[in-house]
Amino acid sequence: MKGFSTTIEINSNPNTIWEILTESSNYHDWNKSVEKIEGNIAVGEKIKVYAKISPDRAFPVKVKEFVPSSKMVWCGGMPFGLFQGVRTFTLTERNNGQVEFRMQEEFSGLMSPLIVRSMPDLTESFELFASSLKAKAESVA
């Protein structure tokens, strides 16, 4: 199974970070890896993510899990389990007043070996997402 992940420490609080992560209309203002998000980021909702690496292509996902200020899971892919991407965002409050932000995406399904072989390396995009979130959260903290 192929996947990508990034982790960063943010000098802010989980509620501030969560507000930034879940306000879809403002992604273009702070996120250097996401062009825009269409839709409402809430459990059960379908949203469309437009990444800067492919700004003309929408990635439709469904918000599967939504635990305020803690965890969010987006899922998207092909029907019948042929291919699925699961992106998980977690916020963990540390004793030192920082919050650990982790974002990971894992791919699975029967078509996964073929599809992931042609995918670009998303490591840089994930790190840019995390550093953009850190900069925004620390500027409003």
PLM region spans:
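Hydrophobic ligand-binding cavity/cleft-lining segments
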Residues: 1-38, 42
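Alpha-helix N-cap/helix-start motif
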Residues: 20, 30, 56-59, 84, ...
